[in-house]
């Protein structure tokens, strides 16, 4: 870890490997995440895993390496654990990339093929063992919707905060044992990479995430609210039909010429979280005026998948969900979705903004 003020390598997109570390070495503010999530075909079970290289929690005495594991069951019970590895290895080979986060008592790994079509996550800990495998139903993408490789695309989604999606949407197979209980199912999966020059608390006021698998359609949306640009929205969406990209946009302003989309939170459903934002679902509209194409998707939460509380009613709630939709005037499809709604507090006793324009 660099403690000097000298510049470090910091990836900004282009042809950089999506899976490789995005900063070398770590410094005092920049952090990154490899994130995997999934929802079962009955929309009742879910998981989310996070692999981190991030100094922003070192003040808690836990170091710069972290792995988080969360699962949800149909009866509303949830399991969560966080481990702090002593070692981290990223191996880049011709076949793909392997990541290892380990200590004497546990081991977490992921493997992503070079074409980013397949992924496998494995873990061996005192409480959790098993494997999650994914087969992509989409294509790796940048925030601007272009698919990898794209030399002129940037990974910067908003000021000082970056994302790419190696696997926007996938079919997932889960075969795990948690506290001696089998946790095995098939469903929706996905993977994204998130990194920033500063902490999430510095860069973001909020975030909305949607991942959909319905019939031939695979959809991924991330929308960020900037803290540095005080409330400005930075949305990004991509839709795939039988694995081929058919729509992408960062524009939410209605137009007679340019492709655009809208996402609206709904509050008339039955399943919500414990935070101030009682969202129960989403409505999505994707419009391509030039091609005279229009898709709609209606999402209704089925179960609370995970939740983290940041104080004063803020934090993040993730849900497994049902979805119904497709192209207007054509066959409509039922499927499954994962959503997340995140709001950061305006102030925190633990974290201070790391960015200043002065």
Swiss-Prot record:
- InterPro entries xref list: DA_C (IPR054499)
Q: Note the superkingdom of the native organism.
A: Eukaryota
**GO MF term list:** isomerase activity
User: EC number(s) for this protein?
Assistant: 5.5.1.-
Q: Which Pfam families match?
A: DA_C, DA_N
Q: In which pathway does it act?
A: Mycotoxin biosynthesis
Per UniProt, the keywords (alphabetical) are: Isomerase, Virulence
Report the sequence similarity comment from the record.
Belongs to the Diels-Alderase family.
Q: Its biological function?
A: Diels-Alderase; part of the gene cluster that mediates the biosynthesis of the mycotoxins phomacins, leucine-derived cytochalasans with potent actin polymerization-inhibitory activities and monocot-specific antigerminative activities. The first step in the pathway is catalyzed by the hybrid PKS-NRPS phmA, assisted by the enoyl reductase phmE, that are responsible for fusion of the leucine precursor and the polyketide backbone to produce a 2-pyrrolidone intermediate.
This chain belongs to the protein called Diels-Alderase phmD
- Organism the protein comes from: Phaeosphaeria nodorum (strain SN15 / ATCC MYA-4574 / FGSC 10173)
């Amino acid at each position: 870890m660099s403690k000097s003020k000298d510049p470090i390598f910091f990836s900004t997109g282009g042809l950089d490997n999506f899976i490789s570390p995005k900063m070398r070495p770590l410094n005092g503010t920049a952090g990154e995440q490899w994130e995997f999530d999934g929802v079962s075909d009955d929309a009742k079970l879910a998981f989310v895993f996070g692999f981190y290289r991030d100094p922003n929690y070192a003040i808690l005495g836990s170091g710069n390496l972290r792995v988080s594991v969360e699962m949800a069951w149909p009866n509303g019970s949830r399991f969560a654990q966080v481990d702090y590895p002593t070692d981290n290895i990223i191996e880049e080979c011709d076949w793909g990339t392997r990541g290892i986060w380990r200590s004497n008592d546990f081991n977490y790994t992921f493997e992503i093929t070079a074409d980013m079509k397949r992924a496998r996550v494995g873990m061996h800990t005192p409480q959790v063992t098993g494997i999650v495998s994914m087969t992509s139903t989409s294509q790796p993408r940048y925030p601007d919707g272009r698919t990898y490789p794209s030399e002129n695309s940037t990974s910067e989604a908003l000021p000082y905060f970056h994302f790419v999606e190696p696997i926007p949407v996938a079919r997932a197979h889960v075969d795990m044992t948690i506290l001696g209980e089998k946790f095995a199912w098939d469903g929706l999966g996905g993977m994204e990479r998130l990194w920033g020059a500063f902490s999430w608390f510095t860069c973001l006021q909020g975030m909305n995430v949607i991942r959909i698998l319905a019939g031939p359609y695979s959809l991924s949306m991330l929308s960020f609210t900037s803290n540095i640009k005080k409330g400005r929205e930075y949305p990004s969406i991509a839709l795939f039909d039988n694995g081929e990209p058919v729509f992408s946009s960062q524009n939410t302003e209605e137009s007679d010429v340019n492709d655009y989309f809208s996402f609206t939170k709904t509050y008339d459903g039955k399943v919500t979280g414990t935070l101030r934002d009682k969202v129960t679902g989403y409505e999505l509209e994707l419009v391509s005026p030039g091609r005279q194409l229009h898709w709609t998707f209606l999402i209704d939460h089925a179960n609370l998948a995970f939740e983290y509380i940041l104080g004063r009613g803020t934090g993040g709630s993730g849900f497994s969900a049902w979805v119904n939709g497709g192209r207007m005037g054509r066959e409509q499809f039922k499927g499954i979705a994962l959503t997340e709604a995140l709001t950061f507090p305006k102030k925190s006793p633990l974290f201070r903004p790391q960015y200043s324009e002065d």
